[in-house]
A protein has these predicted regions:
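Short N-terminal edge-element motif at the start of the domain
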Residues: 1-55
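Solvent-exposed helix/loop surface patches that form functional interfaces
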Residues: 1-17, 23, 71-152
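Short strand-coil-strand connectors
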Residues: 8-12, 66-68, 86, 158-162, ...
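A structural detector for short beta-strand units
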Residues: 16-18, 46-48, 69-72, 163-164, ...
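Short, solvent-exposed coil/turn segments at beta-strand boundaries
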Residues: 21-27, 51-57, 75-78, 149-152, ...
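A short local loop/turn or secondary-structure capping micro-motif enriched for an aromatic residue
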Residues: 37-39, 67-70, 91-92, 164, ...
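Hydrophobic/aromatic-rich structural module bridging two neighboring secondary-structure elements via a short loop
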Residues: 37-85
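C-terminal structured interaction module
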Residues: 155-185
């Protein structure tokens, strides 16, 4: 899988350029997000890189916000998260996936890791990363595979009381996350 996409942010003024490359023993995903909250005095640029193993488990995450605030996380893929210096982050224990608030790519991780059958539901603990603050917290999310149409798959996505139906392509990348993100064709 070598793919490049652009997503439009439909909640805020902004967009993301995203690329994913399959290497010998891993995937490398990179994104550059530009968005504005309110007026241009509250504009942000976010760059991130996610190193994944071939089963879509996050191994390493680097995020840089506004060219100077950064976050580096590492994971063993079994629910243990570490800072750059190797220090364990206890409050994230048990979470397997990341959810970076400013990108729809995060949804691809649990979707691509599982072999879904129609009407199957999966429950996940996610490391939620709030952008631009880089605050970390563990959150529960669920996906239910509800429909397919050719190469398109539809999932009911839920986090706490929020629920929506998202559409992904054959690579598991978001095409439509209603009123939040839409892929530019």
């Amino acid at each position: 899988m070598n793919q490049k996409v652009v997503w439009k942010n439909e909640e805020l003024f902004g967009c993301e350029y995203f690329s994913i490359t399959k290497e010998e023993k891993n995937f490398s995903a990179k994104g550059t997000i530009i968005y504005v909250e309110g007026d241009e005095s509250n504009a942000h640029i976010v760059e991130y890189k996610v190193d994944l193993d071939t089963n879509w488990f996050t191994k390493k995450l680097t995020i840089i916000v506004d060219e100077h605030n950064s976050l580096n996380l590492m994971s063993d893929g079994m629910g243990n998260w570490f800072k750059n210096d190797g220090q364990v982050i206890d409050k994230l224990k048990g979470a397997i996936d990341i959810d970076i608030s400013a990108t729809p790519f995060s949804n691809s991780l649990p979707i691509n890791r599982m072999d879904w059958v129609l009407n199957q539901e999966g429950h996940f603990e996610m490391v939620y990363i709030s952008i631009p603050s880089l605050e970390l917290k563990k959150v529960p999310q669920s996906y239910k595979y509800i429909n397919n149409n050719g190469n398109l798959r539809y999932f009911k996505y839920r986090c706490y009381d929020y629920e929506t139906t998202i559409c992904v392509d054959e690579q598991g990348l978001i095409l439509d996350y209603p009123n939040v993100f839409r892929r530019v064709k």
